[in-house]
Amino acid sequence: MEPILFSSNSHSDDRGTVFFTNELNLKNVVRTYKVQNKLIKTVRAWHGHKIEEKWISVEEGEFLVCAVHIEDFDNPSNDIKIHKFTLTPTDGILYVPNNYANGAMNLTENNSIRYFSSLPFDESVKDDYRFDSKFWDPWSELNPNFYE
């Protein structure tokens, strides 16, 4: 399975606007966390899981969010397809399946991105695989200011 972007829609009337993502099912979500970067173009990558699934929603600003499918977490190939998504708050929610690593870079100064996870924190840390932020590099073409 590949990452899926569940598109959001909206309806406006004289009261305001409602944004919705009706095709999305979050029944497997057990926790959430939000990230805000101090510097524009901060790269936070790569964070992978064999078991855990992620759903990603931009709450403020614009982000480049990327995901790579990993066959071998102990010896990953750096010559694999990078799934790239440029997301804003109105674009929808990105689903990242298990056996993927993901990363994000904020493209705006004011920014906020929310992650939804399918595992409790104590189980997630046992399924946590970190890779150097430049191991797969979709970021450099956008001149990042900081890699984490």
Describe the residue ranges of each PLM region:
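Non-catalytic, conserved peripheral segments adjacent to functional cores
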Residues: M1-T90, E109-E148
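Short beta-strand His + acidic residue motifs that chelate non-heme Fe in jelly-roll/DSBH
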Residues: L94, N102-L107
